[in-house]
Amino acid sequence: MTPKPYCLFVTSFLPYPTGGGSAMRASVALEVLSSRYSVIVVQPELWARREGIFHDDWVRAHSAAFFRIHPHHVQDIRPLVEDFLAGEPGGAALDVVYAFRQAVAPLAINCFNAAGSRPRVTILDLDDDECAHNEQFAPLHEAAGEAALAAKLRSEIATKKLFLAMLMPRFNHLLLASADDCRTLRSRHPAHSFVHLPNAVRAPESPAAGVNRDPRSILFVGSLDYLPNEDAVAFFARSILPLIRERDDRMTFRIVGVGQSESIAAVRRFPGVRLIGAVPDLVPEYASAGMLVVPLRAGSGTRIKILEAFQHRTPVVSTTKGAEGLAVTNGEHLLIADTPEEFAAACLRLSSDDDLCRRLTEKAHAWVVQHHSIDTVRRILRECWGAPSIDSPRPRH
């Protein structure tokens, strides 16, 4: 049997099939890569570890080696990779290097000639446009009274643009979750290969047993220490939920996700709010919810939470911003509402109209299976690693 070629996968997020969007996107990429390559996963811990929900057993099952690196020891990444390759039979070398997110790109570049040869294909998965990310986060910090932090985010935009401009020539392919981000960056940097790699969601392995859908249960899913989600939860609890409960005080707002902040904890005091926090399995949450709400007012990329709800046949109400980057149609796949009054009315419609829920979820499920499956990601990544892009130069040293 011919041994698999080797791929280095560098990510600051621990790949995991449930939880935050970045962890889920990284897990899909790793699953696809591991079907073709012996993958060496390197995770520099640039952010605090989330214990109890994310486990490295999933990564170890999908990799040939897994190295978790303390931020003070990132200089050890290349020697670790070289030592691993030296211990493999037949003069092992890297065929592909895949960097997940801009922050780890320099660490991946430093390994390009590990074991004495350059990788055939180099990929930088940007996920989203980080400059747009800063531009949208700054007003949220201003609204929270954090003017200094807002100013800092704006001051970083020029530096991030310069950093990206320096990184792009080193990679054959630059991946983005949003087709809109792809178009924007292609127009700015026509010499480089930007590839739309949509987020993907897995079909549930089995339905939630013994769980009945409650049409009056409103679900929010997301990382609860991510500023746009903090703003969205507070916006819904303060401005939308009271309007809903004026009409039907049996309606409840269930908040599920990893992490937590002071602003999230503060919404506990509102009538009808159920702050659940992290759960090991989202299948029962989607199965029991009458709807998922995505009341985002800022953010970038695409919303995996919407794709998950579509896969689980849970109706969705979202702001325009929340559904940004997804080729979905209001009234066909989900309901779009931007003012508190419109959003409350949409939630009340779903709670009382079974036929509407059925029409939306049937269309939404068919759409997500067609456009956001792991098979879609597999096809696109195979095209990337099939041959380097003619538009982007080979890695330099």
Could you tell me what each predicted segment is?
Residues 305-309, 315-319, 335:
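Short hydrophobic beta-strand element within catalytic cores of glycosyltransferases
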